[in-house]
């Protein structure tokens, strides 16, 4: 039995992860934590999310005493916190010998020079960053098992990279073009006018400047054009990607490339059939659908995930189970 502490448990991702860990027979929850100044401290999780009424746990403030208890009692800590908060907490818990699964972007780039541009802070822990592994579960399982510092990928990168990585050896130098739509839960639980459901209308945002673009490009090893969109639905992501493949590539070559997922139980691949968000919501699955035009060399692949599950909480759980060989 492995004991897991969850910090940032009041948010959508933290609460979803709590439910997933609670359902695992080989995992237990050491505690649920929020910041000391959170208005949710002392409240039951079920007060915030009645759907989790079967989970009788309270949100505790992350005091120094609480941190000491986590170190003494937990095997791992999951951080569902802001990037700048995770930056410090991840380094501290790692230094105490715990396995750290960070859902923020604070450890996703190995290059410290990326952080001021994309996250607005200087990275203060290069020695910890050097140990971090990018937790794209289907691709980096060996590294996830071998390290105690796991950076869980972003939601858009998970959808995009799951679709693109099998094609790496077939791509030309032309940039893949990624158009992705996410539900409003991707913006978090904090009240904001532009993410109020009555205000949301399908629209692009972060055009040619979203921080997930360099994350995707770094992990793919090739630049991409990435345009996210905010959709008027609660949860889920659909990424539709257009790529140019090398001259002479055949449909059989593409099928062979995607056969890498034949033994991946959470990834479903279909040729000439395209996924929809409803089929993956509330699941840990990724559904891929592709079609290739041999005459032009262009391929379109669509990737559907639940942004709170495969794009965050369930992928964190995958990494936990991989790391502890569960």
From Swiss-Prot:
Entry keyword set: Amino-acid biosynthesis, Arginine biosynthesis, Cytoplasm, NADP, Oxidoreductase
EC number: 1.2.1.38
SMART domains: Semialdhyde_dh (SM00859)
First and last residue of the signal peptide: none
Gene Ontology CC entries for this record: cytoplasm
Reaction equation(s) it catalyzes: N-acetyl-L-glutamate 5-semialdehyde + phosphate + NADP(+) = N-acetyl-L-glutamyl 5-phosphate + NADPH + H(+)
Pathway involvement of the protein, from the record: Amino-acid biosynthesis; L-arginine biosynthesis; N(2)-acetyl-L-ornithine from L-glutamate: step 3/4
Family in the record: Belongs to the NAGSA dehydrogenase family. Type 1 subfamily.
Name of the molecule in the record: N-acetyl-gamma-glutamyl-phosphate reductase
Originating organism: Shewanella oneidensis (strain ATCC 700550 / JCM 31522 / CIP 106686 / LMG 19005 / NCIMB 14063 / MR-1)
Gene name of the record: argC
